[in-house]
């Protein structure tokens, strides 16, 4: 691919969610005078590729990550690069050093002078001086050098100048620009208020971890003002943000820190004005007209988009998101949904192959690894099958397919095991490998297969879990709800903790004394699932209880009073939103 790109006079390659392990390919690009910018989030190996630039939050300086949030998704890294390029093209502040200055009283007669130095809206330096008026000149402080050749912005310049004159004397002239009038005009809610007052009413100050002062308020206002004034956050950025949110959910990244912010802001953008490609897919999936949340994106949208890649035609999903012509987008959306149906059929067929093999191999791999391989398993089904094996056996799982003499494997973790332990013990056998502690993959020459099996048997003996197997079946309850709390207002609580996903599971409740007033069954060919109506007093709740048909008339029956553990969700039927309980466990009182 690199040679083909060079033959077409390409000069720059930007990777997305890959590249950190592609040392040979990037070396070839260098030989062909092609620059490579790597954007990735996978763990780097000991040797980094010789790329023009590497952007990866998992790169360390010694034992410490350089970037403050190493779990950023690959699509999040790419989104940040796209946003930075857009800022460079549109902003007058690109590359320009700026200082923000504020003064405030300290204890006694002293004053605090605090300042931030910014470049590209990011803090690159900060300085704080505490001075008693008349005890020092400006040349006795570090301020002169800090302010040298800098554009200085302040809030209420007249007040700041009076304070500085009081500290250093009236002979010192500070050349500063007052942003209070401009920001106040752009954001009427802050007009006429001091930084001290704004700090008192700031949500950021209220929920900040650690100190949050007046200068922090000024910095946040400045960034928001520049974004608004220069119209940096328009449809184009919103559409990119939506894709970053969907990608972060699809990649099963932990929902905290920046991932949570990206998903939350991205979902808000989706519900405000959806990306055209997503909108066409959402329409064909029957989701149009409803407010989308993380659950719909995770369960109904992400698998469909991913299906094209599973079926070896990832370019179709990419084209849907790039296509400008509405008719062509409609055709592509229909094609992707057809591939998703094909993927489901393939997954069911491959499961009948992989499950017996993994079961047979359990003892061989010390009961610590679910491992299946077959010439009949297509490469596109390895990931989804490994995921299903992991869930089924509550063990780390590996599924391998073979094609043209190459073994391709997908691994999924369970019970807190870090997959790097297996991969590193076999690394010299691989053509390439990479991933996370909980999802990874590799490719390998089939000639190394016997050596790999031997290594894997040894590695499996060393697997240790951070969570016992029983924990996988334990239900953790977030709150016990009195029956009076089971009303539609409960969604205000549930939505407060959105978005849900990895490391932020949906809220699980316990309620006692519910009466079963109706029982039905779901399914035409099989009646495995149960639908219930539960009486909570003022409100009657529709409920589903999956795989519970055999429990009817055994563990509970009509008119029983029960205690239930459940989630509360929204179900859509014929265009109407219906609150619904999803039962996880139920016991007769």
Residue spans for each PLM region:
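Short gly/pro/ser/thr-enriched loop/turn and capping motifs at secondary-structure boundaries
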Residues: 22, 43-47, 61-63, 180-185, ...
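A structured phosphate/pyrophosphate-recognition subdomain
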Residues: 50-122, 180-359
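Flexible, glycine/threonine-enriched loop-and-boundary segments that flank and lead into catalytic domains
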Residues: 361-387
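Conserved DEDDh/DEDDy metal-dependent 3′-5′ exonuclease domain
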Residues: 128-188, 215, 221-222
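N-terminal small/polar loop signature for handling phosphorylated ligands or for N-terminal nucleophile
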Residues: 1-48, 54-56, 60, 130-156, ...
């Amino acid at each position: 691919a690199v040679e083909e790109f060079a033959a077409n006079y390409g000069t720059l390659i930007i990777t997305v969610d890959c590249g950190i392990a592609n040392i040979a390919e990037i070396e070839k690009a260098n030989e062909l005078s092609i620059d490579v910018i790597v954007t990735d989030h996978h763990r780097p190996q000991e040797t980094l590729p010789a790329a023009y630039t590497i952007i990866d939050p998992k790169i360390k300086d010694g034992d410490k990550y350089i970037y403050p949030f190493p779990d950023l998704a690959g699509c999040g890294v790419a989104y940040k690069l796209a946003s930075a390029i857009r800022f460079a093209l549109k902003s007058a502040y690109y590359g320009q050093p700026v200082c923000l200055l504020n003064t405030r009283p300290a204890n006694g007669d002293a004053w605090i002078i605090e300042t931030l130095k910014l470049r590209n809206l990011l803090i690159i330096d900060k300085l704080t001086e505490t001075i008693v008026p008349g005890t020092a000149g400006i040349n006795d402080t570090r301020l002169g050098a800090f302010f040298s050749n800098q554009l200085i912005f302040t809030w209420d310049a007249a007040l700041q100048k009076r304070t500085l004159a009081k500290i250093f004397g009236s002979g010192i002239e500070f050349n500063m620009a007052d942003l209070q009038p401009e920001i106040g005009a752009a954001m009427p809610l802050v007009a006429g208020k001091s930084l001290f007052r704004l700090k008192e009413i700031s949500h950021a100050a209220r929920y900040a971890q650690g100190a949050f002062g007046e200068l922090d308020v000024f910095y946040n206002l400045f960034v928001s003002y520049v974004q608004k004034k220069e119209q940096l956050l328009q449809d184009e950025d919103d559409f990119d943000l939506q894709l970053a949110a969907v990608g972060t959910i699809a990649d099963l990244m932990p929902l905290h820190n920046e991932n949570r912010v990206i998903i939350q802001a991205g979902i808000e953008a989706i519900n405000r004005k959806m990306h055209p490609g997503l909108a066409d897919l959402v329409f064909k999936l029957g989701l149009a007209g409803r407010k989308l949340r993380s659950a719909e994106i995770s369960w109904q949208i992400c698998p469909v988009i991913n299906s094209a890649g599973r079926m070896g035609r990832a370019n179709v999903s990419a084209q849907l998101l790039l296509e400008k012509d509405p008719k062509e987008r409609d055709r592509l959306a229909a094609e992707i949904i057809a591939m998703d149906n094909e993927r489901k059929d393939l997954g069911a067929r491959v499961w009948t192959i992989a499950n017996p093999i993994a079961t047979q191999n359990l003892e061989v791999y010390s009961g610590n690894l679910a491992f299946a391989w077959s010439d009949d398993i297509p490469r596109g089904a390895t990931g989804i099958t490994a995921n299903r094996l992991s869930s089924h056996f509550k063990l780390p799982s590996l599924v391998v397919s073979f094609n043209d003499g190459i073994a391709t494997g997908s691994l999924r973790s369970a019970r807190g095991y870090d997959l790097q332990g297996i991969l590193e013990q076999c690394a010299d056998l691989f053509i390439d490998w990479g991933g996370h502690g909980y999802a990874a993959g590799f490719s390998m020459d089939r000639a190394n297969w016997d050596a790999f099996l031997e290594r894997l048997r040894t590695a499996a003996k060393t697997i240790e879990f951070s969570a016992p197997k029983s924990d996988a079946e334990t239900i953790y309850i977030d709150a016990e709800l009195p029956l009076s709390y089971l009303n539609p207002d409960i969604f205000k609580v549930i939505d407060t903790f959105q978005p849900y996903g990895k490391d932020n599971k949906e809220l699980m409740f316990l309620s006692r004394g519910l009466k079963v007033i109706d029982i039905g069954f779901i399914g035409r060919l099989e009646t495995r699932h149960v639908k219930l109506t539960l009486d909570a007093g003022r409100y009657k709740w529709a409920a589903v209880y999956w795989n519970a048909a055999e429990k009817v008339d055994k563990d509970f029956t009509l008119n029983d009073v029960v205690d239930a553990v459940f989630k509360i969700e929204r179900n859509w039927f014929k265009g109407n939103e219906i609150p619904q309980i999803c039962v996880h466990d139920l016991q007769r009182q």
